[in-house]
């Protein structure tokens, strides 16, 4: 599915207000890790994989995805999700949406795919912050973060990932820990438990009276240096 989404086209739809992901962190980041799988737009390769799995245009794979109509950090969820839905259809994946309110979606994310609130969904689309190793990777890949402990909605994890996480947690020098986290990130991208759609760039409108604002690569803004004329 990661091969089916034309992210350049999506960026055009959003007026340039997104960055194209190659994983949870970008190439050049200390946690990048140089994964073997390249997240890209390659419909022919995706169709080949789907055909090998027994699917076709006349026999598509059907899946339900829980999404929200609005909400914190969701960018433009309805047009974006509909764009992805159309993209996946070219790769023999027929997506049905279960559209729910943002706070309900966020709660469902915590209780997991096996809960009745999932309403039979096979996936959930929730934006997330990647500000530290736990938020970025661990909570989605550890067998110790299965619901309701944390946000491993799809119960993804195994002994290999638990070992990679333990290696990072038990390494206390910065370079060694970054190397361990890079190995974890590389394996996450290679196993692809997510479809990486977009990095939010946090567009905002500011009054000319506001000074010393620094745009972070995050949703979280440091207001301490900001002044107003």
Protein language model annotation of sequence segments:
Residues 32, 71-75, 104-106, 129-133, ...:
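Flexible loop/turn segments at secondary-structure boundaries
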Residues 89-146, 180:
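Periplasmic binding protein-like
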Residues 4, 140, 187:
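Conserved catalytic core of Hanks-type protein kinase domains
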Residues 1, 65, 88, 109, ...:
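Hydrophobic, well-ordered secondary-structure elements that form the walls
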Residues 30-45, 55-61, 110-117, 138-166, ...:
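Short, solvent-exposed loop/beta-turn-alpha elements that line the ligand-binding surface or hinge
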Residues 27-28, 102-103, 202:
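Conserved beta-strand edge residues that scaffold enzyme active sites
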Residues 12-15, 53-72, 116-126, 171-208:
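Bilobed periplasmic-binding protein-like "clamshell/Venus-flytrap" ligand-binding domains
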Residues 2-86, 90-91, 155-160, 176, ...:
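Append "and occasionally in soluble cytosolic enzymes with long acidic Gly/Pro-rich linkers
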């Amino acid at each position: 599915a990661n091969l089916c989404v034309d992210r350049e086209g999506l960026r055009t739809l959003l007026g340039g207000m997104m960055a194209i992901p190659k994983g949870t962190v970008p190439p050049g980041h200390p946690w990048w890790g140089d994964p073997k799988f390249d997240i890209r737009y390659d419909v022919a390769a995706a169709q080949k994989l789907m055909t090998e799995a027994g699917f076709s245009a006349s026999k598509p794979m059907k899946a339900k995805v829980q999404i929200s109509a609005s909400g914190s950090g969701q960018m433009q969820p309805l047009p974006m999700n509909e764009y992805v839905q159309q993209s996946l259809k070219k790769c023999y994946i027929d997506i049905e949406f279960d559209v729910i309110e943002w706070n309900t979606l966020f709660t469902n994310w915590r209780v997991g795919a096996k809960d009745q609130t999932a309403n039979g969904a096979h996936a959930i689309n929730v934006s997330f912050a990647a500000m530290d190793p736990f938020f970025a990777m661990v909570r989605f890949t550890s067998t110790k973060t299965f619901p309701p402990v944390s946000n491993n909605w799809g119960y993804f994890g195994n002994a290999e990932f638990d070992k990679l996480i333990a290696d990072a947690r038990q390494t206390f020098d910065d370079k060694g820990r970054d190397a361990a986290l890079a190995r974890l990130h590389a394996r996450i991208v290679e196993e692809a438990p997510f479809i990486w759609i977009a990095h939010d760039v946090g567009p905002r409108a500011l009054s000319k009276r506001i000074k010393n604002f620094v745009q972070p690569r995050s949703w979280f803004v440091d207001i301490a240096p900001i002044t107003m004329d």
